[in-house]
Amino acid sequence: MPLIYMNIMLAFTISLLGMLVYRSHLMSSLLCLEGMMLSLFIMTTLMTLNTHSLLANIVPITMLVFAACEAAVGLALLVSISNTYGLDYVHNLNLLQC
């Protein structure tokens, strides 16, 4: 396995561990989630380039679009919670339920 794939898998694993460790703060969770999505994007881009598949070229772009939508929704929740409560704790999200 080439070294670049191992580095990207290590970046994904570190982001996943960060997500598990810093799950009480929304900002830290969003940053770790973005790190995971970035490493997945790079991995799918490299796999698409190595397989020379023309039909799979849209997959990394679609993943990037979903990551941007996830970031927008996460930042909107972060702004809403920080304006209401002044904190970015995840347990404040439970108060938004119907």
Swiss-Prot record:
Family matches, as InterPro entries? NADH_UbQ_OxRdtase_chain4L/K, NUOK/Mnh_C1-like
Q: Which GO terms describe its biological process?
A: ATP synthesis coupled electron transport
Q: Where does the protein end up?
A: Mitochondrion inner membrane
Recorded topology in the membrane: Multi-pass membrane protein
List GO molecular-function terms, semicolon-separated: NADH dehydrogenase (ubiquinone) activity
Coarse class of the primary localization is: mitochondrion
The EC number of this protein is 7.1.1.2
Q: What's its catalytic activity?
A: a ubiquinone + NADH + 5 H(+)(in) = a ubiquinol + NAD(+) + 4 H(+)(out)
Q: Name one GO cellular component term.
A: respiratory chain complex I
Residue ranges annotated as transmembrane are: 1-21, 29-49, 58-78
Keywords attached to this Swiss-Prot or TrEMBL record, sorted alphabetically, are: Electron transport, Membrane, Mitochondrion, Mitochondrion inner membrane, NAD, Respiratory chain, Translocase, Transmembrane, Transmembrane helix, Transport, Ubiquinone
Q: How does it assemble?
A: Core subunit of respiratory chain NADH dehydrogenase (Complex I) which is composed of 45 different subunits.
Similarity comment: Belongs to the complex I subunit 4L family.
Against PANTHER family, the record matches this protein to: NADH-UBIQUINONE OXIDOREDUCTASE CHAIN 4L, NADH-UBIQUINONE OXIDOREDUCTASE SUBUNIT ND4L
| Function text | Core subunit of the mitochondrial membrane respiratory chain NADH dehydrogenase (Complex I) which catalyzes electron transfer from NADH through the respiratory chain, using ubiquinone as an electron acceptor. Part of the enzyme membrane arm which is embedded in the lipid bilayer and involved in proton translocation.
* Name by which UniProt lists this protein: NADH-ubiquinone oxidoreductase chain 4L
